[in-house]
Amino acid sequence: MTAFHSLNVSASALTAQRVRMDVVSSNLANMDTTRAKQVNGEWVPYRRKMVSLQSKGESFSSILNSQMSGSGNAGNGVKVSKITEDDSDFNLVYDPTDPDANAEGYVQKPNVDPLKEMVDLVSSTRSYEANVTAMNATKGMLMKALEIGK
């Protein structure tokens, strides 16, 4: 594994975590949106979105097996495989004054839990910071290698 390969792995992780932070930000921004899109002629609330990540190239088990046997490469980084909607039920809130309230006075609110979103945001931020640290360490090693020839 070359130093430039490790930079590419960290860069792919930075991109994936940035997408994850963008999705969490969108979830938090739309946590009160009761009219996100029309389904069968009726407005439905915003649905929480989730990011799925996967490794680029080979699967983890095949990389592990090749490393255990002393051959192969250490992986190619990570990528966003898909962004899916959370199919859990919407939250029902009693507010008969809301224009979106049903006949009983309940309003369907998005299935976004701000606590869950903040945990995801902190997790992706920590992962982002760890990858920046890894990139800086690689950069430091490359700079030291360049100084050897002086």
From Swiss-Prot:
Disulfide bridge map: none
GO cellular component terms given for this protein: bacterial-type flagellum; bacterial-type flagellum basal body, rod
Record has Plastid as a keyword: no
Localization annotation: Bacterial flagellum basal body
Entry keyword Oxidoreductase: no
A Pfam short name: Flg_bb_rod
InterPro entries for the chain: Flag_bb_rod_N (IPR001444), Flagellar_basal_body_rod_CS (IPR019776), Flg_bb/hook_C_dom (IPR010930), FlgC (IPR006299)
Domain of life: Bacteria
GO BP annotations listed: bacterial-type flagellum assembly; bacterial-type flagellum-dependent swarming motility
Keywords: Bacterial flagellum
PANTHER family linked to this entry: FLAGELLAR BASAL-BODY ROD PROTEIN FLGC (PTHR30435:SF2), FLAGELLAR PROTEIN (PTHR30435)
NCBIfam families in UniProt: FlgC
Subunit structure comment from the entry: The basal body constitutes a major portion of the flagellar organelle and consists of four rings (L,P,S, and M) mounted on a central rod. The rod consists of about 26 subunits of FlgG in the distal portion, and FlgB, FlgC and FlgF are thought to build up the proximal portion of the rod with about 6 subunits each.
Recorded family membership: Belongs to the flagella basal body rod proteins family.
Name of the protein in question: Flagellar basal-body rod protein FlgC
Species name: Bacillus subtilis (strain 168)
Gene: flgC
